[in-house]
Every structure is written in C-alpha cells, then in structure tokens.
From Swiss-Prot:
Protein name (database record): Subtilisin-like serine protease Cla h 9.0101
Residue ranges constituting the Inhibitor I9 domain according to the UniProt record: 44-136
Keywords: Allergen, Glycoprotein, Hydrolase, IgE-binding protein, Protease, Serine protease, Signal, Zymogen
SUPFAM superfamilies: Subtilisin-like
PANTHER family reported for this sequence: CEREVISIN-RELATED, PEPTIDASE S8
Length: 518
C-alpha cells in the first residue's frame, strides 16, 4: 500500500509540473527528468535520504565508485571475448559529492544504465535526477546608454522623470563588509570598476580557465558592486564559475558551485568568530542562470540560504510561470522578475506566485570583458537579479559588523527577504498578471539607518508622468505650438500672395493696354 501511495503522489506531481518521474519498480528511487530542459546523456544527480550521515555518505561514495569501475572492467572484458567492435561508451563515474550545510547530501556522476539501476535500489538513495544543461538568462546586446537607469529606479519611489533619471540615492559605504558570491560565468576581476574588491573564488567546470570568457558574470558582478554601475559600491565580489564561455553548463556543476558558496560563507563566519577577520557583516549570492525544473538545485539553494547566505535568483526569460524553472522555484531565495524604464513588466520576464519582487532588467549597462574598462548594455532577468543581490548586500552592510561592540543578532535570510518585500513599492508596474506580486525593489532612498528604512514600510505607487510620458507631453505641446505658429504664418503668406497676385494682375493689365495703343 505504501508503494502504491508513493507511486500515486509522484504521478500527480508529473502531471502538475514540468518534472517527469519514471515509473517506480521494486521500491527503487524515482528518476526525475525536466520536460522543459535538454538532458546531458548518462549524467545524473543523486540525493540521499535524510538519515544519511557524513560517514554513511563516504561509504556510499566508495561503494558507487567501486561498482562503476567493476562494471566498466566487466563490460570491456565481455566485449573483448565476443569480439564485438569497440564503441565509445566510456563512463567517468563519480563527478561531484555534495554536502551543503547538511541541508542537501548527495553526489553526481556519469554512469551507465546498470550502475544507475543499482544506485536506485540502494536504501540510502531518495531520488535520482537526470543532469541537464543550464544557461545564462540574458538577451541580445542593446545600444549603450550614458547612465545606469536601474540604479536610479531602485532609489526612487515614483516613476523616473527628467529630474531623477540620472540620480542614484545611496549610502556611500553600502555593501562594506559583505561578500557577494556571483555564481555564473566568472568575473573580470581586474576591471577598474571593482577597485580591487573582486577576487576569484572557484572554477567548477573541469579543465576550464579561471576567467570570464563570456561577459555575463562580469555584467552581473558590476551591477552588484561596481563603483559606477553597482548597487552596493563597497561589497566584495567572489567569482564562482559554473558555466563555460558559451554561457551554458551542467546542473550538477551549478549545484557544486552553490555548495562552494555555502562552505566559503561558513568559513568566513568561523574565522570572524576567531577574530581573524574584522568587519565581516555577512554574505549574499546571485544566480542569473536557469534551466528546467530541478528539485536538487532548488534544494541546494534552500540549504545554502539555511546556512546563512542571502540568495537572489533570476525568474527567467520565457514569459512563463517561473515556478516551472530552477532555481527560480527555490522558495527560500528571492526570485526576481524584470521591469522596464517605462515601469512595465519586461515582455520576456517570467511571472507567477514564485516571483517575489521586480527590479530593472531592460537595457542595463554594466561592466564587461575584453579590457579593464569595457562596458556593455544587455537585457534579461539576469540583469534584474543582481540589482536585488546588491540590495541585499547594501541592507546587510547597514548593520554593525559581527565583531563590533555594537553587534546585534544576525538578520536571517528569511527576515531580510521579508523586510525587502515589506519596504518595496507596491503597484508600480503595468502588465503584471494577477497571480504575481506587483512590487518593485527599493533601497531606502539614501537612508543609512536600516531600522528607519524598515519602519517606513511599503509605498503605494501613485501615477505620475514617466519620463517617456513627459517626452510625449512636451512633444504634443511643441507640436501644437508649431501648428499654431504655422497656421498664422500660412495666413500671412496667403495675404501676401494675394497682394502679389493683385499687383501682378494690375501690372499685366497696364502692359496689355500699352500694347494695344502701339
């Protein structure tokens, strides 16, 4: 009966979401696939059951690698005996092991079908998920603008106007003492806009270089913490490369990157308690990437948040329900949709109940690769999410340092997320579906006291002319003026023409009279 009920609940899940679950047989763990993603053949992520300890996990890892190697040897020997042609079916075995602050334990690897079937039947295994491709969430480059309007927008309550378009209201030390893990394609750490505050954390894809060969991660990092382009201008960026230079990678590598960020954060907490780091105030993270629904990635992000990292993730660029994508569906993170200069939901932005907040994401200028001065303007929820990751760092920095005599209890990610939402601007955007929170991120408008910002609470947007509406209004006034002046001029021209015609007619009459006399 227990197995039948489990099968029923999983079947229901498969029909209600883009996650497909293979049929369960002999009490084997299910294999989960994302129907809206491209799978990586014969690559899997495995999640342990909650009872598994570190020692049990280590024993299991040894067992699975031994099983893999014996299976490979046996198949090779069988092929030799049968004189079958050699085929390229070499499997690499164990790739990653996971332990994200005890909240997610498991591993990933490249296994053949026989091995994965035995893994499924192991009593320590809860589920098996097919690995899938993950990609950045940006769109094509746009013409560069002279100023980052997104910064101005998150520091003003009402729609931007000519008077506020280039004005970013902020606290000078915003972000100081906070580490921001940008889990992406890497970061151009030598860019001048980082002022030496960016460093390389870890490269996850095997054999890849410690550099951003794509630009996407650098752009996100600049929006988080750049001197000119960043929300939190004193934060420290930690580059975590999980995607290759083409902007894509594997879900299993992304999970490993999340684990690195969590472990690194906990290490900083530990050395701060030992007095080896001064002024540390906490960590945030940004993931402007996505793929199909992945319960393991969502679990990884939730575990990292439980470990103390304040996570911002992009909602996605498919103009669809963000709950069908990961990590957008991770409930502990802050899921961010994209808005436009005209205070609209960006046409590409995902929506739905998994969205927590909106931030600027169309035509965003920030740092780039190619030189230490390079900039680029691109669009996507990838550009919206780092506004919020930077804002989380900004708000964290307004607290006393953990080693300060004035230190207070840490603001948990859950509490800061709730505060971020509570102070946001309500009803600012148009074209937001009814099942989606219509709130726009706000940084406090330059206020440096965190409690004072929170006490201000939310703000109901009032419709004031946007900058585009101002342009349209002034154009209409100018048009009317031109029309009025043109009408007056035309009348004068008509009068003059009539006088000229009368004069010419008179002259012609006189000329004909003279001709008749001759």
């Amino acid at each position: 009966m227990r197995g039948a009920l489990a099968g029923l609940s999983l079947a229901t899940l498969a029909t209600a979401s883009p996650v497909l679950v293979n049929s369960i047989h002999n009490d084997a763990a299910p294999i989960i696939s994302a129907s809206n993603a491209k799978e990586i053949a014969d690559n899997y992520m495995i999640k342990f059951k909650d009872h598994v300890t570190q020692n049990l996990a280590a024993e299991h890892h040894g067992w699975v690698q031994d099983l893999h190697e014996k299976t490979q040897v046996a198949k090779t020997e069988l092929r030799k005996r049968s004189q079958s042609p050699m085929v390229d079916d070499i499997f690499n075995g164990l790739k990653h092991t996971y332990n994200i602050a005890g909240g997610l334990m498991g591993y990933a690897g490249h296994f053949d079908e026989d091995v994965i079937e035995q893994i499924r039947r192991h009593p320590d295994v809860e589920l098996v998920e097919r690995d899938q491709e993950v990609h950045v969430l940006g769109s094509e480059s746009e013409v560069e603008k002279n100023a980052p309007w997104g910064l101005a927008r998150i520091s003003h309550r009402d729609s931007l106007s000519f008077g506020t378009f280039n004005k970013y209201l902020y606290t000078e030390d915003g972000g100081e003492g906070v580490d921001v893990y940008v889990v992406d394609t890497g970061t151009n750490v030598d860019h001048v806009d980082f002022e030496g505050r960016a460093s390389w954390g870890k490269t996850i894809p095997q054999g890849d270089a410690d550099e951003d060969g794509n630009g996407h991660g650098t752009h996100c990092s600049g929006t988080v913490a750049g001197k000119k382009y960043g929300v939190a201008k004193k934060a420290h960026v930690k580059a975590v490369k999980v995607l290759r230079s083409n902007g894509s990678g594997s879900m299993s590598d992304v999970v490993k990157g999340v684990e690195y960020a969590a472990e690194s954060h906990l290490e900083q907490v530990s050395i701060t308690k030992k007095g080896k780091r001064k002024g540390f105030k906490g960590s945030t993270a940004n993931m402007s990437l996505g793929g199909g629904k992945s319960p393991i990635l969502d679990k990884a992000v939730n575990a990292a948040v439980d470990a103390g990292i304040h996570f911002a993730v992009a909602a996605g660029n498919d103009n669809a329900d963000s709950c069908n994508y990961s990590p957008a569906a991770a409930e502990n993170a802050v899921t961010v949709g994209a808005s436009t200069l005209a205070d609209e939901r960006a046409y590409f932005s995902n929506y739905g109940k998994c969205n927590d907040i909106f931030a600027p994401g169309l035509n965003i200028q920030s740092t780039w690769i190619g030189s230490k001065y390079a900039v680029n303007t691109i669009s996507g929820t990838s550009m919206a999410s780092p506004h919020v990751a930077g804002l989380l760092a900004y708000l964290l920095s307004l607290q006393p340092a953990k080693d300060s005599a004035f230190a207070v209890a840490d603001i948990s990610p859950k509490k800061l997320k709730a505060n971020l939402i509570s102070i946001a601007t309500v009803g600012a955007l148009t074209d937001v579906p009814s099942n989606t929170a219509n709130i726009l991120a706000w940084n406090g408008g330059g206020e440096s006291n965190y409690s004072a910002i929170v006490e201000k609470g939310g703000y109901k947007a009032t419709h004031r002319p946007t900058m585009l509406e101002e342009i349209e209004s002034e154009a209409k006034v100018a048009s009317k003026k031109v029309y009025s002046e043109g009408d007056e001029l035309a009348h004068k021209v008509a009068e003059l023409t009539e006088k000229v015609e009368d004069l010419i007619a008179g002259e012609l009459k006189d000329m004909f009279r003279e001709l008749k006399r001759e």
